[in-house]
């Protein structure tokens, strides 16, 4: 949440332009573009880039996808907000759902910087939010593209059941 320096702002503008160009090429080629998730302290900038390009290039279908790490406590709500934003602004949401990959690093940084860990307290909570995210996406499948990034058998079977029920 620190203010960027002038040099950092200039660099971020270059990143925005590069992501725009890549998104534009993906749209022209009719190929999906998956923007990967990172650590919580840099994720807001990535989310902003993904949202901006989804709004521009996902008018007819999902081309640009953001990655939602459901091992974070706040990401189910963020997914719901993104879906609402897509509905309100007339764009399809591209959602790649994953559990997450930075658990130890996130917890260590939270201790070091003295803030609450953004990571779910238990694996069961991660599983719960992952499955709730699947349900949210399938219920809104008419305005979504979904990539379910999981090896979890229960979640895969749950997704199959949801698709039978809603899609």
Model-inferred region functions:
Residues 1-167:
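Positively charged, amphipathic and often flexible ligand-engagement surfaces
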């Amino acid at each position: 949440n620190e203010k960027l320096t002038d040099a950092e702002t200039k660099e971020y503008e270059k990143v925005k332009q590069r992501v725009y160009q890549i998104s534009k090429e993906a749209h022209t080629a009719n190929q999906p573009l998956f923007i990967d998730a990172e650590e919580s302290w840099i994720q807001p900038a990535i989310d902003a880039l993904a949202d901006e390009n989804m709004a521009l290039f996902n008018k007819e279908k999902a081309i640009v996808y953001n990655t939602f790490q459901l091992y974070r406590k706040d990401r189910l709500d963020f997914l719901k907000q993104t879906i609402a934003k897509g509905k309100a602004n007339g764009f399809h949401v591209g959602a790649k759902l994953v559990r997450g990959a930075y658990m130890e690093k996130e917890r260590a940084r939270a201790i070091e910087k003295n803030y609450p860990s953004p990571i779910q307290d238990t694996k069961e909570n991660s599983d719960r939010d992952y499955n709730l995210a699947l349900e949210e996406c399938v219920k809104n499948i008419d305005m979504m593209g979904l990539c379910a990034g999981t090896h979890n058998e229960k979640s895969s079977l749950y997704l199959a059941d949801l698709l039978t029920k809603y899609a």
